[in-house]
Amino acid sequence: MPYLITDDVSSKPDHRSLDVPWQSVGAKCVVTLAAKLMLAVLPPQTSFFKLQVRDDKLGEQFSPEIRSELDLSFSKMERMIMDYIAASNDRVAIHQALKHLIVGGNALIHMSKDGLKTFPLNRFVVNRDGNGNVLEIVTKELISRKVLDVELPEPQPNRVVDETGSEKDDVEIYTCIKLDKSTGRWIWYQEAFDKVIPNTRSTAPKNASPWLVLRFNTCDGEDYGRGRVEEFLGDLKSLDGLSQSLIEGAAAASKVVFLVSPSSTT
């Protein structure tokens, strides 16, 4: 699926282009598996969670009528949350993250006030400790200068510009997320041209971070995970090689050569 990890237009001109597969069997398998996982994570017309109060917190002083009223209120809240998810683009972001987890094994989801946003593997880096806990995250985004309300330096005349001309209109924004061990809170801010952008610093509790770094398969001692596709990499490479040979052989066999007839007058 070439659209999952695309070529970085802001990289160097000598950047090696990513390979395009010769078959789509792997893509069909990824789409099918992502759809099944999507039904398990966010089933349609069904709540995937339940709100309730623990019995040890309620005590025995509450009557059954009060308990039933609490259950009814919680059911209304569940429906409100499900309606909000259905009206937002959260399903699209989660479905995209599932594809990245299946193929690359890694995905980053940011839960903001505007909804969920998925970062592919070529748009973020992560650092973990020996136990797999996230210590630091850095993301990269291309944002138009018109959207930013801060003054930024103009691009240099001798700077490499891509064919689309996005180097003049877009700015590379880096978001740094760190865990402050002294306060036990997550701190993040944004930078552009090696300078911190004003009014971009935010914090969150350690157990309520809006940045979710997901891994499909966990490998001990590694910062990144491994995808489901890696388990079948040998079969996919063999299929891709055979498909390439079949396509190139068919193209060579279908070559048409026009010759002049000896009996013709021309």
Q: Where on the chain are the PLM-derived regions?
A:
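Generic detector of intrinsically disordered, low-complexity, polar/charged segments
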Residues: 23, 56, 101-102, 129, ...
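Extended, charged amphipathic alpha-helical segments
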Residues: 187-266
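Compositionally biased, low-structure terminal segments
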Residues: 4, 49-50, 63, 175, ...
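Short, well-ordered loop/turn elements at secondary-structure boundaries
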Residues: 102-105, 168-171, 182-183, 233, ...
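Active-site and NAD+-binding cores of ADP-ribose-processing enzymes
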Residues: 108-220
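Extended, helix-rich architectural segments
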Residues: 1-159
